[in-house]
Amino acid sequence: MSIEQEIKQTKPFHSSNEKAIINVIYTNNWLYLHHNKLLKKYGLSLQQYNVLRILNGQNGEPLTINSIIDRMLDKMSNASRLVDKLFLRDYVTRVENKADRRACDVAITNAGRTAILEVEKELIDLQNSMSNLTDTEAEKLSDLLDAMRGK
C-alpha cells in the first residue's frame, strides 16, 4: 500500500522529498510499534535493548555512559537511567572508572547476554516477516537513508 493510501492523503505531496520524509517518519513509527511490542514481552524498552546490544558488541569490554550515548540510536534517551534499570535486572555491571572517578564503566553480564540472545531470535523472525525487500533492495535502502542524512 502506498504512503498516500496509508495516511489517506487526497492532495498530492508538494515534492518527492516531502513524500519521502513523510514515508520515512511513517515507516519509523510502524517499525517502532512492532519492535516495541515484541520487546515488551521481555520487559525491555527499545532503548534498553539498544544499550544491551551496544554492550554486547564490546566483547566483555566496559564502556562509559558517554560512550554508550555516542552509539545509541536515540540520542535523547537518559542513558544513566536506562543503565540503572538494566543493573537492577542484573543485565549490566557498573564499576567506577579508574581514570575518571566521575565516570562509571558499564559492562554486560551473562544474564544480559542471555536476554539478548532470546530477544534476537524473535526479532530476526519479526524482521524477516516484515521485510518485503531483497537483500539488494535492503542495502540500497540503507544507502539511500545514509544519503538522506548527508553521510
Predicted regions and their residues:
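C-terminal regulatory/oligomerization modules of transcriptional regulators
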Residues: 1-12, 136-151
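N-terminal leader segment of winged-helix/HTH proteins
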Residues: 1-42
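Pre-recognition alpha-helix immediately N-terminal to the DNA-recognition helix
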Residues: 23, 50-54, 114, 140
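N-terminal helix-turn-helix DNA-binding core of bacterial DNA-binding proteins
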Residues: 33-75
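Short, hydrophobic-biased segments on the C-terminal half of alpha helices
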Residues: 65, 83-84
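Charged, amphipathic alpha-helical coiled-coil/dimerization segments
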Residues: 84-139
